[in-house]
Structures are given as structure tokens and as C-alpha cells.
């Protein structure tokens, strides 16, 4: 019976250590965590928390030249978070839309103007 108790305690200790190693702050550490139709964003303020945000829809605000970034964040509680494929402030537009340089909004692409930003520019 003493061996059984020791095994249980060891199992619980392993679970606690495993859970502590998987700590994550916010919704995401990569856009892949957010699923289709969303991306991982981090705000502009110090100690912002990563969150999943919907991709820009027609007429939504967007940021021209906002490529995905890899960031290493440190928080006052000692937690460090590595973000990959994440965006500052807002997600890019949906794939069928483009961020207009003139209006900074998601619009349908138009071949006749140079005012559109192709979202696929930063994709592999």
C-alpha cells in the first residue's frame, strides 16, 4: 500500500510539473492556434496579452505593411512568451481582400490601381 501511495504522489507531481511547463498567456502563441479566419495579435501597449482576432472584412481598418512577426515577450511576473506568425495591432485582411494604401481599409483588389496591398506578399 505504501508503494501505491508513493506512485500516486509521483504521478500527481509529474502532472503539476507538466502543467507548469505548458503555461501560455492569452489565446495564442501563433496564428495557427486561432484557426481559419483569425490570426494571433499583440497590442501596442506594454505587457499586452496575445489574442485571436478575426481577419479583416470588407471595410475594416487594416495596416499596410504589417507582416507576421516573431516576438519574444517578457512580463513582470517572470513569464516569457515566444510568439510566431503574429501581428501587431490587427490581422491582415481576408485572403480575397487587400489593404488599401489610400484608406487603410480592407477592399476588393483592383488591378487598375497601385493603392492596394497584396496580403499574400508575406506568405511563403
Swiss-Prot record:
<feature type="disulfide bond">
    <location>
        <begin position="39"/>
        <end position="91"/>
    </location>
</feature>
<feature type="signal peptide">
    <location>
        <begin position="1"/>
        <end position="21"/>
    </location>
</feature>
<feature type="disulfide bond">
    <location>
        <begin position="34"/>
        <end position="52"/>
    </location>
</feature>
<keyword id="KW-1015">Disulfide bond</keyword>
<dbReference type="Pfam" id="PF06607">
    <property type="entry name" value="Prokineticin"/>
</dbReference>
<comment type="function">
    <text>Cytokine directly involved in hematopoiesis.</text>
</comment>
<feature type="disulfide bond">
    <location>
        <begin position="28"/>
        <end position="40"/>
    </location>
</feature>
<dbReference type="GO" id="GO:0005576">
    <property type="term" value="C:extracellular region"/>
</dbReference>
<keyword id="KW-0964">Secreted</keyword>
<comment type="similarity">
    <text>Belongs to the AVIT (prokineticin) family.</text>
</comment>
<feature type="disulfide bond">
    <location>
        <begin position="93"/>
        <end position="106"/>
    </location>
</feature>
<protein>
    <recommendedName>
        <fullName>Astakine</fullName>
    </recommendedName>
</protein>
<dbReference type="InterPro" id="IPR023569">
    <property type="entry name" value="Prokineticin_domain"/>
</dbReference>
<keyword id="KW-0732">Signal</keyword>
<feature type="disulfide bond">
    <location>
        <begin position="62"/>
        <end position="99"/>
    </location>
</feature>
